[in-house]
Swiss-Prot record:
<feature type="binding site">
    <location>
        <position position="148"/>
    </location>
    <ligand>
        <name>substrate</name>
    </ligand>
</feature>
<dbReference type="InterPro" id="IPR020878">
    <property type="entry name" value="RuBisCo_large_chain_AS"/>
</dbReference>
<dbReference type="GO" id="GO:0009507">
    <property type="term" value="C:chloroplast"/>
</dbReference>
<dbReference type="GO" id="GO:0004497">
    <property type="term" value="F:monooxygenase activity"/>
</dbReference>
<feature type="binding site">
    <location>
        <position position="152"/>
    </location>
    <ligand>
        <name>substrate</name>
    </ligand>
</feature>
<dbReference type="GO" id="GO:0016984">
    <property type="term" value="F:ribulose-bisphosphate carboxylase activity"/>
</dbReference>
<keyword id="KW-0460">Magnesium</keyword>
<dbReference type="GO" id="GO:0019253">
    <property type="term" value="P:reductive pentose-phosphate cycle"/>
</dbReference>
<feature type="binding site">
    <location>
        <position position="269"/>
    </location>
    <ligand>
        <name>substrate</name>
    </ligand>
</feature>
<feature type="binding site" description="in homodimeric partner">
    <location>
        <position position="98"/>
    </location>
    <ligand>
        <name>substrate</name>
    </ligand>
</feature>
<dbReference type="GO" id="GO:0000287">
    <property type="term" value="F:magnesium ion binding"/>
</dbReference>
<keyword id="KW-0120">Carbon dioxide fixation</keyword>
<dbReference type="InterPro" id="IPR000685">
    <property type="entry name" value="RuBisCO_lsu_C"/>
</dbReference>
<keyword id="KW-0456">Lyase</keyword>
<comment type="similarity">
    <text>Belongs to the RuBisCO large chain family. Type I subfamily.</text>
</comment>
<feature type="site" description="Transition state stabilizer">
    <location>
        <position position="308"/>
    </location>
</feature>
<dbReference type="Pfam" id="PF00016">
    <property type="entry name" value="RuBisCO_large"/>
</dbReference>
C-alpha cells in the first residue's frame, strides 16, 4: 500500500529481499507483511471476526538495492497493538518468525527497525548505563581498557586468578571471562569466581583504582544463572556477563536482575555471525544492537574495524551510534534507514574486542571514540615480558594518544610517532611495538554500505 500514512506508533522494519525468479517484488513484500502479522496462505473466514485492516502489517515501499540486481528494500509497518509490551520474544516471533523460510524468496535479511517511543517506554533499557558506569569506575575522558583471559579454556582457578591480578595490576580497568568458559570439569564456576575476585581486590588495593572482572554467569537454566550471578554479587563483583546464545527472554531476565541488584551487565555476542554476517540473508547486527539496548544490557561487543573480526568502518560507526545516541537521524552510508528517538533509554557501551593491539591505538580512538571498552586479549596476555607488561603497554599507549588528541595534535597521522616517543620511557610499550608493529587484519568486509564506496580500514 504505497499510500499508507505511517503512524508515530507504528513499528517499522526494512527487509532486504531477493525474490525467486518470476516473483514480483511488490507481491513478495506484501507476502512478507502478511505472514509476519495476521495472514496465512489462504483467505480464512475468521478474518471477519477481527479488525483485520488494522492488524495486518502494511508493505508501503519497495526500492531496488543500488548495484545489486534482483534485490529490493521492502519497508513494512506494523501496528503497535500487534506486540506484547516489553517482550522481545513476542516481537521477534513476528518479525523474524516464519518469513525467512518463504519459498517465494531466495534470500531475506532484516536490515533495520524503528521503534516508537510508546513501545520503548515498556522496555527497561540498560541496567546501569554509560554515565553511571563511568562514575562507578571513576574513569572519565578516555575509553575503558580490558582484556580477555587466555587461553579461553583449560586454566586452573588459581592460574586464572593470577592472570586477572596481573592484568589489572598492570593498568587495565577490566579483565573478562570468554564466551565459552562457564563451569567445566577443569574449573567450576565457584573456583573461578573466588580466585578472580581475589585478583580484583588485590589489584584494586595496590592501585587505588576501581577494578572489575566480567564473571560469566551463562548456564543451562535461569535458576543456575541467578545462582551464579548472586554468588558474584556476594563476592563483591560490580559486573556480570552473559552470552547472546542464552536467548532473548533470558537476556531480559538478567537485565532485570542487574537493575534490581545494581550490577553492570556485559553481553558477549557469541553466535551472532551465524545470521548477521552475510549481506543477503539473516539480520543486520544493528538490529541486534537495538534489541539488546532495549533488553537491558550495559555492554555489547560491536566491532573494532581493524581487528580480526568482521567490521566495515561505516557499519561499525552505525552500530556504535545505535548504542550510544539518544536520537539518531537517517544515515544511509552507516546503514541507518530510520530516524530513532530512544525515549531516554540509557546508553549501552560498545565493546571493541578481537585481534587488536597497542600499535593500533590511534586508529581505534579515531574510529571508535571515547565511549567504548577496548579489550586487548592476545594484545595483553601475549606480551613477551608477561601479562602485567602487556597491560602497562596498553594503558600507556592509550593515555599518550588521548593526551596528544587533547593537545590538538593530528594524532591519526602522527600516531606511530606518538607511540614511539612514549615507548622511550616505557619498556613494555617498546617491546609490544617491536613485536606487533602495525599489524592489522585488513580483509574485505562482507557487510558493507550500499550507498557509498566503503573506506579502507587502514589509516
Amino acid at each position: 500500500d504505497p499510500d499508507y500514512a505511517i503512524k508515530e506508533t507504528d513499528i517499522l522494519a526494512l527487509f532486504r529481499c531477493t525474490p525467486q525468479p518470476g516473483v514480483d517484488p511488490v507481491e513478495a513484500a506484501a507476502a512478507l507483511a502478511g505472514e509476519s502479522s495476521t495472514a496465512t496462505w489462504t483467505v480464512v473466514w475468521t478474518d471477519l471476526l477481527t479488525a483485520c485492516d488494522l492488524y495486518r502489517a502494511k508493505a508501503y515501499r519497495v526500492d531496488p538495492v543500488p548495484s545489486t540486481p534482483d534485490t529490493y528494500f521492502c519497508y513494512v509497518a506494523y501496528d503497535i497493538d500487534l506486540f506484547e509490551e516489553g517482550s522481545l520474544a513476542n516481537l521477534t516471533a513476528s518479525i523474524i518468525g516464519n518469513i525467512f523460510g518463504f519459498k517465494a524468496v531466495k534470500a531475506l535479511r532484516l536490515e533495520d527497525m524503528r521503534f516508537p517511543v510508546a513501545l520503548l517506554k515498556t522496555y527497561q533499557g540498560p541496567a546501569t548505563g554509560l554515565i553511571v558506569e563511568r562514575e562507578r569506575m571513576d574513569k572519565f575522558g578516555r575509553p575503558l581498557l580490558g582484556a580477555t583471559v587466555k587461553p579461553k579454556l583449560g586454566l586452573s582457578g588459581k592460574n586464572y586468578g593470577r592472570v586477572v591480578f596481573e592484568g589489572l595490576k598492570g593498568g587495565l580497568d577490566f579483565l573478562k571471562d570468554d564466551e565459552n568458559i562457564n563451569s567445566q570439569p577443569f574449573m567450576r564456576y565457584r573456583e573461578r569466581f573466588l580466585y578472580s575476585m581475589e585478583g580484583v581486590n588485590h589489584a584494586a588495593a595496590l592501585s587505588g583504582e576501581v577494578k572489575g572482572h566480567y564473571l560469566n554467569t551463562t548456564a543451562a537454566t535461569m535458576e543456575d544463572m541467578y545462582e551464579r550471578a548472586n554468588f558474584a554479587k556476594e563476592l563483591g563483583s560490580i559486573i556480570v556477563m552473559i552470552d547472546l546464545v542464552i536467548g532473548y527472554t533470558a537476556i531480559q531476565s538478567m537485565g532485570k536482575w542487574s537493575r534490581d541488584y545494581d550490577m553492570i551487565l556485559h553481553l558477549h555476542r557469541a553466535g551472532n555471525s551465524t545470521y548477521s554476517r552475510q549481506k543477503n540473508h539473516g539480520m543486520n547486527f544493528r538490529v541486534i544492537c537495538k534489541w539488546m539496548r532495549m533488553a537491558g544490557v550495559d555492554h555489547i561487543h560491536a566491532g573494532t574495524v581493524v581487528g580480526k573480526l568482521e567490521g566495515d568502518p561505516l557499519m561499525i560507526k552505525g552500530f556504535y551510534n545505535t548504542l550510544l545516541d539518544f536520537k539518531s537521524e537517517v544515515n544511509l552510508p552507516e546503514g541507518l534507514f530510520f530516524a530513532q528517538d530512544w525515549a531516554s533509554l540509557r546508553k549501552c557501551v560498545p565493546v571493541a574486542s578481537g585481534g587488536i593491539h597497542c600499535g593500533q591505538m590511534h586508529q581505534l580512538i579515531n574510529y571508535l571514540g571515547d565511549d567504548c571498552v577496548m579489550q586487548f586479549g592476545g594484545g595483553t596476555i601475549g606480551h613477551p615480558d608477561g601479562i602485567q607488561s602487556g597491560a602497562t603497554a596498553n594503558r600507556v599507549a592509550l593515555e599518550c594518544m588521548v593526551l596528544a588528541r587533547n593537545e590538538g595534535r593530528d594524532y591519526v597521522a602522527e600516531g606511530p610517532q606518538i607511540l614511539r616517543d612514549a615507548a622511550k620511557s616505557c619498556g613494555p610499550l617498546q617491546t609490544a611495538l617491536d613485536l606487533w608493529k602495525d599489524i592489522t587484519f585488513n580483509y574485505a568486509s562482507t557487510d558493507t554500505a550500499d550507498f557509498v564506496e566503503t573506506p579502507t580500514a587502514n589509516v
